[in-house]
Amino acid sequence: MQPRDLSDHSPYVPGRGVEEVARDRGLDPDDLIKLSSNENPHGPSPAAVDAIREHADRVHQYPKSSHTDLTAKLAEKWDVSTEQVWVSPGADGSIDYLSRAALEPGDEVLVPEPGFAYYAMSARYHHGEVSEYALSPDDGFAQDAETVLSAYGGERIVYLTSPHNPSGSVMPLDEVRAIADATAEETLVVVDEAYGEFAEVDSAIPLVDERDDVAVLRTFSKAYGLAGLRIGYSVVPEAWGEAYARVNTPFAANELACRAALAALDDEEHVAESVETARWAREYIADELDAPTVESAGNFVLAEVGDAERVAEEAQERGVIIRDCTSFGLPNHVRISTGTREGTREAVARLNETLADLGLGVRA
């Protein structure tokens, strides 16, 4: 017996981890600076760590009350009903829930190229088809309604990413509204705001209450520093509320993740520090790296270095882990996550040495 034909399904390619690189390179993990996965360099909120410790002896229980409490807290934060908040194992989980709720076999989704691979992966898992709209490095991967609508052909779901991964460009709220206005009544416009805390643009969540064709994805992985716990959520139109119970994987958002997220929501100081550091670091990288960069509103910077694979490999030899963006269809670009001030300065210095030695990436 064999699994079904999965030849159209491409595996997700994550950034490499510290331990993995240290083993491969024979390096001390403590000497490595990991800037490949857009993680929070400050780690989780101390309050979240305390909550994990406090509730660790309860993991034999299903996360019913913690899930309910987190849903209520998020609904209060965004001024929506609890039925509109779909808590999930990471924002990826919410993408799957929306696929389950929206897609019939053969339905299409429209996704950005380059972009986050899981939009297409989830659609194909759920027997959907995938179309793309192109974002170009020639204009800094600028996002607007015209770009999306020129590729739109009645797809069931249209994915927007603001800030966009891997470029960091944003989709202004007026452009989101224009896309929702121009698409068909049965098209759901999904705005992925995984990096929303780092941007200086308005969230699209208020649109969810204005209309029934917009949903928004959010996560605790980035600004809240809970990537390892896999906890996220979506805010959906009120009319979609009752679908959650029919598509949600039971108890998929685990007890410790829900408890940590509840505590992290109250630690506004930790989030503010994380955002401040990211904004400082992305400006530092843009100013000091010896390569052209794309203006970013995320906790990362996309740089054009000429040969992403060579630069990423050589950078690892110097103890800096960055993301080779060849898997995004950008073989000339690397993505550099924002680190601490000290880590960012040191990483940029080592990257500049790498670029100089390779004769690549010098600013035009």
Curated annotation (Swiss-Prot):
Residues 1-46 are annotated as: Disordered. Its cofactor is pyridoxal 5'-phosphate. Keywords: Amino-acid biosynthesis, Aminotransferase, Histidine biosynthesis, Pyridoxal phosphate, Transferase. The modification N6-(pyridoxal phosphate)lysine is found at residue 222. Residues 17-33 have a biased composition (Basic and acidic residues). Pathway: Amino-acid biosynthesis; L-histidine biosynthesis; L-histidine from 5-phospho-alpha-D-ribose 1-diphosphate: step 7/9. Belongs to the class-II pyridoxal-phosphate-dependent aminotransferase family. Histidinol-phosphate aminotransferase subfamily. This is Histidinol-phosphate aminotransferase.
